[in-house]
Swiss-Prot record:
Belongs to the YqgF nuclease family. This is Putative pre-16S rRNA nuclease. Its main location: cytoplasm. It comes from the Bacteria. GO terms for molecular function: nuclease activity. Pfam families: RuvX. Its EC number is 3.1.-.-. PANTHER family: POLYNUCLEOTIDYL TRANSFERASE, RIBONUCLEASE H-LIKE SUPERFAMILY PROTEIN (PTHR33317:SF4). The keyword Nuclease applies. It comes from Ruminiclostridium cellulolyticum (strain ATCC 35319 / DSM 5812 / JCM 6584 / H10).
């Protein structure tokens, strides 16, 4: 069982993958989506097949007041595109403050600002996926 974590953005898509047991999330890569969403979706298809992905957890942008905005609509369109890639569950995960947490973590690790741009999306995908993995692990214990 492998679960894919995605932080979708108009310019970049952060990607993370779970370990085979579904306990931990590891950053996989950042895919540029600004120039060609079609190429980005093709790369995701390759990853899904390579890792035999059973579930995809995608960061779902909700405003701080709980409403949906333009980013939510774009994410919904992206979800429609990836839902055609295979047989897997797609889980929408509240991503509020994920990018803030990713920046905070990178600051604590001493990562320079010039390097953050290429890492923040993948780090956000890791945080999204790990949040989901922690939730399902907690549900299994109950």
């Amino acid at each position: 069982m492998r679960i894919l974590g995605i932080d979708y953005g108009d310019s970049r898509i952060g990607v993370a993958i779970s370990d085979p047991m579904g306990w931990t999330a590891q950053g996989l890569e950042m895919i540029k989506s600004k120039d060609s969403l079609k190429k980005a979706v093709l790369r995701l298809s390759e990853i899904i097949n390579e890792y035999s992905v059973t579930d995809i957890v995608i960061g779902y942008p909700i405003n701080m007041n709980g409403t949906k905005g333009p980013r939510t609509e774009r994410t919904e369109e992206f979800i429609k595109k990836i839902s055609d890639l295979g047989q897997f569950n797609i889980i929408k995960w509240d991503e509020r403050l994920t990018t803030v947490s990713a920046h905070r973590t990178m600051n604590e690790l001493g990562i320079k600002a010039s390097k953050k741009k290429g890492i923040v999306d993948t780090m956000s995908a890791v945080l999204i996926l790990q949040g989901y993995l922690d939730r399902i692990a907690g549900n299994k214990k109950s």
